[in-house]
Every structure is written in structure tokens, then in C-alpha cells.
Amino acid sequence: MDARQMKIKAAQAALGYVESGMRLGIGTGSTAEEFVRLLAEKVASGFQIQGVPTSERTARLCLELGVPLKSLDELPELDLTIDGADEVDGKLRLIKGGGGALLREKIVASASERMIVIADESKVVDVLGAFKLPIEVNQFGLTTTRLAIEKVAARLGLTGDIGLRASGDGPFMTDGGHLILDASFGRIPDAEALAAGLNAIPGVVEHGLFLGMASLAIIAGPEGARTLTAG
């Protein structure tokens, strides 16, 4: 079973948690896109949901495949969000944002009664941090914000490159018009302390640490899909 097949397995398992009539947050990324394709098949057969996308990319795919969408302002409270992750640990702490949609992903997840993460087994880690931590920042005062991030990291014993994400000939721009700094900290033993420190920096719009948000993870491997709960 290759990586895409595992993503499809996880998405299929997640679809079993979606009930007709739900207000559904729909995530961003390659695994979430497999979920959208499967969801579209159910919608075509008469399944009723109202979706709220976490990115313009997801919105385009949903519209292309016929998945009905609303804005979060129209549906400010959601029943369930299904989204992928770049890393997930045994306590269901996540690193997200590899696709650049971390701010909207976190807003949508926080508006949901429940968040289910779908991923293949390569995303499961003992300690977060092998994947670069995305940090969404305001364009104004970029250097000041980067220095502040470095100071927060240093206080926690974290070092590593903090690079500006690029796209083509310029910087990557989020759907909200912000920049992303990707921090290569390596192991992050105290994710809560790092999150608190980043939250206190004025130029940081949001970061990719999703802590205490997921209630279940569906992890697919060669033998099929399994579920993880916070341990």
C-alpha cells in the first residue's frame, strides 16, 4: 500500500463519522483532499452536509466536485471538522500548516464540537518537531518578529533556522495576506510553553501547534486504519 492509498484509507474511515445534516469543517492538504473526493461521492448520492472550507484551495476542490459550501460567518458553529496533520503525537498534539492554511484551519477547528485528524502512519511521532513548525506572521516588522521568535525559542533551549517560506520568485502568501516563517527547531519537548511564548509575540498571527483540539486521530498504515485517542 503506497502513501496515497493510506491517505484514502484514513479518509474512508473518517467518512464514517460524518452524519447527514452535519455542519462540517473541511481541512486542507493532500489527505483532506482525498476526504473531499470521497465526500463528494456521498453528496452525489443524496447525502446532505454543509461544508466550511479551511482554505481557498479546499473551496475550489469542493465547488469543482459539487460539495455544498457555506462561510464560517453563515455557519459559526460546526458539528465536526475533518483535517490532516503534518505531525501527531500520542497526546493528539499536532503540527499543522504545511499547506499554508494554519490560521483558517485553527479558526474552523475551534468552531467545531469535534475535530478528527486523518493521516498516514509516517505522521505519528513520539515528540513533535521533526517537521518544520509553520508560524504565520504579519508582513510589517518581519525582522522584529523573527528575532522575538528566536528569543522565545532560546529560552526553551530550542535552536534552528527560521526561514521565510517562498513561492515562485517571492514569498509565500497565505489566504489572509500574511507570510509564513518555517522554524526548524527539531524536538519540541514542551509544546505548550512554546505555544504560549509565540502567542505573546504581537507580530505572530498564528502558529502550527494545535494543542488540545483533536479528539480523535485516524491513522492509516499497510494493515489498514486505526484510531488514536489522547493518552
UniProtKB/Swiss-Prot annotation:
Pathway: Carbohydrate degradation; pentose phosphate pathway; D-ribose 5-phosphate from D-ribulose 5-phosphate (non-oxidative stage): step 1/1
Keywords: Isomerase
EC number(s) stated in the UniProt entry for this protein: 5.3.1.6
Reaction equation(s) it catalyzes: aldehydo-D-ribose 5-phosphate = D-ribulose 5-phosphate
Molecular functions per Gene Ontology: ribose-5-phosphate isomerase activity
Positions of the catalytic residues: 105
Highest taxon in the source lineage: Bacteria
Pfam families registered for this protein in UniProt: Rib_5-P_isom_A
BP-aspect Gene Ontology terms: pentose-phosphate shunt, non-oxidative branch
Residue sites binding substrate per the record: 28-31, 83-86, 96-99, 123
Disulphide connectivity of cysteines: none
Summary of subunit composition and partner proteins: Homodimer.
Family: Belongs to the ribose 5-phosphate isomerase family.
Name of protein: Ribose-5-phosphate isomerase A
Species this protein is from: Sinorhizobium fredii (strain NBRC 101917 / NGR234)
GN (gene name): rpiA
